[in-house]
From Swiss-Prot:
It comes from the Eukaryota. This is Activin receptor type-1B. It is found in: Cell membrane. ATP binds at residues 213-221, 234.
């Protein structure tokens, strides 16, 4: 607007200057005579070969009248000369081409430069609406937040009150009992599925977290303390609620408890009034996973047999179906690998991470595959899983896939066996054939198309234990799942080997 005003003020000045000069052109036969307001010496008359002009405009608040001559050379552009243009609010200009035709009076321009338009002021109703709207919304948000927090706190305190008032809880959790005593008493006298839910809640809410010992896609694992004993606390992120619920559900299967399956203690959704934590409490094993253990240590022949036999025992118990009123369904792990097997103080294994496991209902011959987005570990997938030929309706198919993965775990263990001072560095299966994080397509090409398996060194034939291990591995890796060994057959073979090698289990 400022630029427009400047340009509009400049034009009248040009007109005044032009008027001062008289606008005279060269005299000639066809010269045009015009009235001239500034031509005192020629009796207010000028002569031109162009046009007569009359203009009235406002400048600095004053009205100015100009009559003058416009030379022909100044009449540009042709048809609409610059000097003949008008502006409704600032100036009124007229050009003509007859002698003294500019002796006319023009309409005075309507006003000065337009002031910038200001928006109209808000009325009282609008002002009230503008102020009251956000204030009301803010109060509404505060009330909703207060009600949500109050609800969570009521639920939290009610749970605490119920736990404190439950006499059976006090009876079970007498102060002279350790965690191990409690788990043993309840698992042997009850259904074999672990602690009652109210006891689980009480235990979980009296655990003191000490240090973080692991992280995964599900969340974190902490070492905690309860009544002088260590426990492992797996804390799931809220988006992994399905995984938490499924794993807790599997662990609480009737008659599941076994010395070679991770001891489940409690599951609880801890609500502290503002957010919910999903806890899964289990036995703590300081050696960590078999993967960590083999990376740190080599093993003797005795140690290798103990690790292999205990892993087979745990898997055989998972796969086994126990018939009866206190029976147990067959369970397939579906994600067996060295990172999901823990090593106990006594050098034995405990199978863990049952979040992907499936149970078989013998009565209806159905499998309860949970709606979980997690998938198994590609490196340990059996050929029939990689090429999608596995029969998902047949429970034995899942057990056969577990056996293939167990064979790979045995290969990891045997490589670290120190026999006659000879051992190999720890490596993952297929380390020399696929990248560190292989795709399903890369694994399928190696395992299904090329039918390759991890290398079994020839020098293992020099040691009976390693020879037996190598033979078992190959029988676990058959492309045809039905031809593979069963977990029970592997357990029996390793039991015989332990007797031959005089291994005390």
């Amino acid at each position: 607007m400022a630029e427009s005003a400047g340009a509009s003020s400049f034009f009248p000045l040009v007109v005044l200057l032009l008027a001062g000069s008289g606008g005279s052109g060269p005299r000639g036969i066809q010269a045009l005579l015009c009235a001239c307001t500034s031509c005192l010496q020629t009796n207010y008359t000028c002569e031109t070969d162009g046009a007569c002009m009359v203009s009235i405009f406002n400048l600095d608040g004053m009205e100015h009248h100009v009559r003058t001559c416009i030379p022909k050379v100044e009449l540009v552009p042709a048809g609409k000369p610059f000097y003949c243009l008008s502006s409704e609010d600032l100036r009124n200009t007229h050009c003509c081409y007859i002698d003294f035709c500019n002796k006319i009076d023009l309409r005075v321009p309507s006003g000065h430069l337009k002031e910038p338009e200001h928006p109209s002021m808000w009325g009282p109703v609008e002002l009230v609406g503008i102020i009251a709207g956000p204030v009301f919304l803010l109060f509404l948000i505060i009330i909703i937040v207060f009600l949500v927090i109050n609800y969570h706190q009521r639920v939290y305190h009610n749970r605490q009150r119920l736990d404190m008032e439950d006499p059976s809880c006090e009876m079970c959790l007498s102060k002279d009992k350790t965690l191990q005593d409690l788990v043993y008493d309840l698992s042997t006298s009850g259904s074999g599925s672990g602690l009652p839910l109210f006891v689980q809640r009480t235990v979980a809410r009296t655990i003191v977290l000490q240090e973080i010992i692991g992280k995964g896609r599900f969340g974190e694992v902490w070492r905690g303390r309860w009544r002088g004993g260590d426990v492992a606390v797996k804390i799931f992120s809220s988006r992994e609620e399905r995984s938490w619920f499924r794993e807790a559900e599997i662990y609480q299967t009737v008659m599941l408890r076994h010395e070679n399956i991770l001891g489940f203690i409690a599951a609880d959704n801890k609500d502290n009034g503002t957010w919910t934590q999903l806890w899964l409490v289990s036995d703590y094993h300081e050696h960590g996973s078999l993967f960590d253990y083999l990376n740190r240590y080599t093993v003797t022949i005795e140690g290798m047999i103990k690790l292999a036999l205990s892993a087979a025992s745990g898997l055989a118990h998972l796969h086994m179906e126990i018939v009866g009123t206190q029976g147990k369904p067959g369970i397939a792990h579906r994600d067996l690998k060295s990172k999901n097997i823990l090593v106990k103080k006594n050098g034995m294994c405990a199978i863990a991470d049952l979040g992907l496991a499936v149970r078989h209902d013998a009565v209806t011959d159905t499998i309860d595959i949970a709606p979980n987005q997690r998938v198994g570990t590609k490196r340990y997938m059996a050929p029939e899983v990689l090429d999608e030929t596995i029969n998902m309706k047949h429970f034995d198919s899942f057990k056969c896939a577990d056996i293939y993965a167990l064979g790979l775990v045995y290969w990891e263990i045997a490589r670290r066996c120190n026999s006659g001072g000879v051992h190999e560095e720890y490596q993952l299966p297929y380390y020399d054939l696929v990248p560190s994080d292989p795709s399903i397509e890369e694994m399928r090409k190696v395992v299904c198309d090329q039918k390759l398996r991890p290398n079994v060194p020839n020098w293992w034939q020099s040691y009976e234990a390693l020879r037996v291990m190598g033979k078992m591995m190959r029988e676990c890796w058959y492309a045809n799942g039905a031809a593979r060994l069963t977990a029970l057959r592997i357990k029996k073979t390793l039991s015989q080997l332990s007797v031959q090698e005089d291994v005390k289990i």
